[in-house]
Amino acid sequence: MLTGISGYVPLNALMKTVFSSPDAPPALGPYSQAIGAGPLIFFSGQVPLEAATGELVGQDVAEQTKQALLNLKSAGLSYANIIKTTVFLTDLSRFADMNAVYATFFPEAPPARSTIEVSGLPRGAKVEIEAIAIKPS
């Protein structure tokens, strides 16, 4: 057990909160849209689906990046609350297309980010974005 670390809080002392929003597409499997633990919110990967219909939005990486990022806002936070993202792309040669849209959502102090090329994504999406946000105090 990690008892000698300054600021350590035992896991059982943190309340786990399940976030679910009709403004974001429902989960495609047995997972939550987002989970809050302490001041952090962990968003499941967002593929570019329209919330009302569950249909894939856009045919290119730019359109799909925009929709995936719009889906992240459904928890009632601003993009300034996002501290880390992971972007999954099916074609890393489209990295610049994703970056051009991504930069419009985070014009100042963008979050830390990793980008990973994958062989496929649900529903034939070209991009998926997961995020970690911090609740405003």
Can you name each region flagged by the protein language model?
Residues 2-4, 8, 13-137:
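Short, polar/acidic, helix-capping and beta-turn segments at strand->helix junctions
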